[in-house]
């Protein structure tokens, strides 16, 4: 994984975290960056369901890398990511969101109340509508260094 050449997601691999939307929308984007998924796919039936629904294995940009328990390594991976996807929509504020806001320069969050309450204007937002995340990825890819720095500053407030 080359620094700033990948989008990242970290979290439990369950349908309610909207992995299907993120994978499908990423596959429909024209980004040349990779999508690195740090999650528990081992012996997870949802992994096979997602593979069947999306055909993600045909997209070489999508990289399921398993789980990372070393917190220092995980922090470094977050810092190296170009952007972080957060698709959680249930359960309130998630620790992985707080960690991402504190260490990833650009965060692309599912547009739900608690994500907006936490990140405010320090993130970009997407919905589950067709084309929403893929167009947000396009906008993110076109950002200047100054724009990225502004998001980072706002996210850390």
Which functions belong to the PLM regions below?
Residues 10-14, 41-42, 68, 91:
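Short donor-sugar binding/catalytic loops of nucleotide-sugar-dependent glycosyltransferases
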Residues 146-157:
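A short, well-ordered alpha-helix in the C-terminal region of glycosyltransferases
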Residues 102-109:
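Short hydrophobic beta-strand element within catalytic cores of glycosyltransferases
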Residues 1-17, 23-30, 36:
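Conserved donor-binding/catalytic core segment of Leloir-type glycosyltransferases
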Residues 123-131, 139-145:
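Conserved acidic donor-binding segment of nucleotide-sugar-dependent glycosyltransferases
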Residues 94-97:
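Short glycine/serine-rich donor-binding loops of glycosyltransferases
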Residues 39, 48-72:
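Nucleotide-activated donor-binding/catalytic signature segment of Leloir-type glycosyltransferases, i.e.
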Residues 76-92, 105:
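Acidic donor-binding loop of glycosyltransferase active sites
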């Amino acid at each position: 994984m080359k620094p700033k050449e990948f989008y990242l997601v970290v979290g439990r691999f369950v349908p309610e975290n909207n992995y299907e939307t993120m994978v499908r929308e990423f596959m429909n984007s024209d980004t040349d960056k990779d999508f690195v998924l740090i999650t528990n796919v081992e012996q997870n039936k949802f992994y096979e369901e997602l593979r069947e629904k999306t055909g993600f294995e045909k997209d070489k940009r999508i990289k399921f890398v398993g789980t990372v328990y070393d917190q220092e390594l995980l922090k470094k991976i977050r810092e190296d990511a170009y952007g972080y996807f957060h698709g959680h929509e249930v359960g309130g504020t998630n620790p992985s969101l707080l960690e991402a806001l504190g260490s990833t320069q650009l965060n692309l969050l599912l547009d739900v109340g608690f994500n907006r309450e936490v990140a405010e204007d320090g993130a970009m937002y997407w919905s589950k509508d067709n084309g929403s995340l893929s167009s947000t990825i396009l906008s993110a890819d076109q950002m200047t260094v100054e724009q990225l720095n502004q998001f980072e500053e706002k996210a850390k407030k």
